[in-house]
Structure formats: structure tokens, C-alpha cells
Amino acid sequence: MDEELKNLIKVWVSAIISISYCYYIPPRIKSGAPRFLSVSPVLALFLVLPLFFSSLHLSLITAFFLTWLANFKLILFSFDKGPLIPIPTNFPRFFCFTCFPIKVQQNPKSQNHLPKLVFAIKLAIFAVLLHLYSYRQNLSPTILLGLYFVHLYLEIEIILTFVKVVVFISLGCDLEPQSNKPYLATSLQDFWGRRWNLMVPAILRPAVYAPMRRVSERKMSSGWALFPGILAAFIVSGLVHELLFFYLIREMPTGEVTLFFVLHGVCTAVELAVKKKTTVAQRWRLSPGVSRVLTVGFVFVTGGWLFTPQLKRSGVMERFTSEAVLLVEFIKR
């Protein structure tokens, strides 16, 4: 643990120095290829930093914040696009909005408060979940898989809520939520675009979807050009997840997780095409309850088929849950 804490300090001091360079130097360079070249050493460094950790949690969190979010935001920043344009007014804001999955609320509410009851319930469920792992040998694979998905959702929610609160206290500005009750999604488009991990689609839209759609519009109508954009965004997301899996497993990718996102990209595109191009979908609509069951069920089944097998084969799922239990015990002390 002591060695991991030392690595944590080294990694994030390196991140602070790198982001400070990006704040003071590249903005003075012409946008486009010249500015991209100026930030490319930072992009390369952020690809390496997660490898400094043996802890799954520290490696994954660092990879998500730096390798994925920060790198994509800096690439967009190189071309005067994305959430870093206009450039934040001071370095602390620039650092937070570069590294963390947050953005300023466009229409701030008069009162911004943490939904304490909901957060407390999530913490309680997470505590019960960690306790259930003591009996994992008595649980069926299907139930255990369900627990893993709930664990993933709750841990992401808890970590991102803490980040949001710390940044809100530090910067004093209203921040948009990181997710919007993904378990209530009524379609794949609703799940991936408006409910799950909202900062990711907010980055993929300008970085991947919009450029691909513009290119596709040269060959087809604008109504059809959105489908290559959707598929491209899911493919890029799959490739990034392969990289995240590499940081966890330290083995060559198998392509399963990319296939998971390609499948969801194709299904989302088909779903959208049916809604837009057929009158049957407009006349015949499922009830919200049935739509939610089908959507969440599809994510669960395909996740068990393609997303988690590599993690289970490598023992990462067991290590990840055991590490969470040890972390809670460490905090209690």
C-alpha cells in the first residue's frame, strides 16, 4: 500500500505538471496540427501512467481520467473544439475540466445540492454487496454476474460523486450530473446517449461522431450519414475499453470488448433507423416498463457474453471485488 501511495503521488504530480504545460504553452500555438504536436508528448505520457500501478482501482481510475478523458479533451483542444474551449479562466479550472468527467451546467439551478438520501442508499447497497462476496462460492454464475454489474455501476457512481463534490467545493460552480439513472433507459440510444456516463458521449460526439458524419454526408444524405457516425463512435469506445482492459489484465486484447461495442453500435443504429424510417415504430410503441426491461436485459445479456468473460478468465473480477473490500477496511481504520 505504501508503494502504491508513492506511485499515486508521482503519477498525479506528473499529471499536474503536464496539464500546467498544456495550459500555458499550447494556447499560444496555432490550432490544428502545430498545437496537436505540442501536446503529443503529454498524450504519450498519459498512455503510460496507468502502468505504474499494481492496484486495479488506481490503474483503472487513472486510465479513465488521464488516458481516456484528458487525452481526448486535449486532442479536441488542439483543434479549438471540445469542453476546454473557451479556455477556462484559471489553471485549477483548466486542470479539473481536463482530467475529470465534469462540465459546467449550462442552465444552473438556483440551488445545487447533493441528493444525500439517494447517495446514502447507494452506499448502503454497496456495503451489502461487498458483504455478499463472502458467500460468492454459494452463488450461481448468473447472480454473481448481476452483482458484478451492480458493483460496477455503484462504484463508478460513488467515485464520480466524490469527484463532483470536491470539484464543486473547490471551484464553486454548478456541475452537470455524470449519469442519469441508466437502469431506467427505454432504449439503447437512451442508455448510451442520455443516461450512462454522460461525459463520454459528450466527448465522442465532437471527436468521432461529428467528423464521421460530415465525411459520410459527402456520399449519402444527411439522414443516413448519422449511422456511420454512430458506429464509428462505438468502435472507438470499444478500442478505448480494450486499452482499459489491458491496463487491468496486462495481456494482449482479445477483441471481445470491441465486439460488444460494435454490436451495441449496430443495434443502436438499427433501433434509430426503425424509429426514423418506418411508420410501424411510430404507431406501435412498447410501454416504458417493457422497454426498460428489454433494454437493461439486452445490456446485461450481451455484457455477460462479450464484456466480462476476459475479466473473469483472468481473475480480475475477483481481484477487483477483493480490493474494494480491503479498501473499505483500510478506510475504516
Swiss-Prot record:
<dbReference type="GO" id="GO:0006629">
    <property type="term" value="P:lipid metabolic process"/>
</dbReference>
<feature type="transmembrane region" description="Helical">
    <location>
        <begin position="7"/>
        <end position="27"/>
    </location>
</feature>
<comment type="similarity">
    <text>Belongs to the wax synthase family.</text>
</comment>
<dbReference type="GO" id="GO:0016020">
    <property type="term" value="C:membrane"/>
</dbReference>
<feature type="transmembrane region" description="Helical">
    <location>
        <begin position="254"/>
        <end position="274"/>
    </location>
</feature>
<feature type="transmembrane region" description="Helical">
    <location>
        <begin position="114"/>
        <end position="134"/>
    </location>
</feature>
<feature type="transmembrane region" description="Helical">
    <location>
        <begin position="229"/>
        <end position="249"/>
    </location>
</feature>
<feature type="transmembrane region" description="Helical">
    <location>
        <begin position="143"/>
        <end position="163"/>
    </location>
</feature>
<dbReference type="InterPro" id="IPR032805">
    <property type="entry name" value="Wax_synthase_dom"/>
</dbReference>
<dbReference type="GO" id="GO:0047196">
    <property type="term" value="F:long-chain-alcohol O-fatty-acyltransferase activity"/>
</dbReference>
<comment type="function">
    <text>Catalyzes the final step in the synthesis of long-chain linear esters (waxes).</text>
</comment>
<keyword id="KW-0444">Lipid biosynthesis</keyword>
<dbReference type="Pfam" id="PF13813">
    <property type="entry name" value="MBOAT_2"/>
</dbReference>
<keyword id="KW-1133">Transmembrane helix</keyword>
<dbReference type="InterPro" id="IPR017088">
    <property type="entry name" value="Wax_synthase_Magnoliopsida"/>
</dbReference>
<keyword id="KW-0472">Membrane</keyword>
<feature type="transmembrane region" description="Helical">
    <location>
        <begin position="45"/>
        <end position="65"/>
    </location>
</feature>
<keyword id="KW-0808">Transferase</keyword>
<keyword id="KW-0443">Lipid metabolism</keyword>
<keyword id="KW-0012">Acyltransferase</keyword>
<protein>
    <recommendedName>
        <fullName>Probable long-chain-alcohol O-fatty-acyltransferase 5</fullName>
        <ecNumber>2.3.1.75</ecNumber>
    </recommendedName>
</protein>
<feature type="transmembrane region" description="Helical">
    <location>
        <begin position="288"/>
        <end position="308"/>
    </location>
</feature>
<dbReference type="InterPro" id="IPR044851">
    <property type="entry name" value="Wax_synthase"/>
</dbReference>
<keyword id="KW-0812">Transmembrane</keyword>
